[in-house]
């Protein structure tokens, strides 16, 4: 059952949130806040199915991956019904770290200057030969 603190914030347990994962009641967690998206299902630009796949669980990573607009973020605030209970916050899987591989640029003056210079020289010679035939 939801608990209330002194600040009138309703806290929901993860177990309670997981019960709301169908089209009659669709709740998701975003940044430890609980959203009731039931009335928004048909209005969602990405389609109802996208929200239903995340229903009853943490949708933070997927929400951020999509790159929602400022308007979408403002609209989402109207669907907040409470927060995930602090005791359950550690139960949510943290997003896996994304490894970014960078390629060190070992390109030398050879590839940056000599090859383009030779290519330009060849094109100039071919042009000159072509013009000489006329």
From Swiss-Prot:
The keyword GTP-binding does not apply. It is found in: Endoplasmic reticulum membrane; Microsome membrane. The modification N6-acetyllysine is found at residues 7, 10, 19. Pfam families: Cyt-b5. Residues 9-85 form the Cytochrome b5 heme-binding domain. The chain crosses the membrane at residues 109-131. Cytochrome b5 is a membrane-bound hemoprotein functioning as an electron carrier for several membrane-bound oxygenases. PANTHER family: CYTOCHROME B5. This is Cytochrome b5. The gene is Cyb5a.
């Amino acid at each position: 059952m939801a608990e209330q603190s002194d600040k009138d914030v309703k806290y929901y347990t993860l177990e309670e949130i997981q019960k709301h994962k169908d089209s009659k009641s669709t709740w998701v967690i975003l940044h430890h806040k609980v959203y009731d998206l039931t009335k928004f299902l048909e209005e969602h630009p990405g389609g109802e199915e996208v929200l239903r796949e995340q229903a009853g669980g943490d949708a933070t990573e997927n929400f951020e991956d999509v790159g929602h607009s400022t308007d979408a973020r403002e609209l989402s605030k109207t669907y907040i019904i409470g927060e995930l209970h602090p005791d359950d916050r550690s139960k949510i899987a943290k997003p896996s770290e994304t490894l970014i591989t960078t390629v060190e640029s070992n390109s030398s003056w050879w590839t940056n200057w000599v090859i383009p210079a030779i290519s330009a020289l060849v094109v100039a010679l071919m042009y000159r030969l072509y013009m000489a035939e006329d």
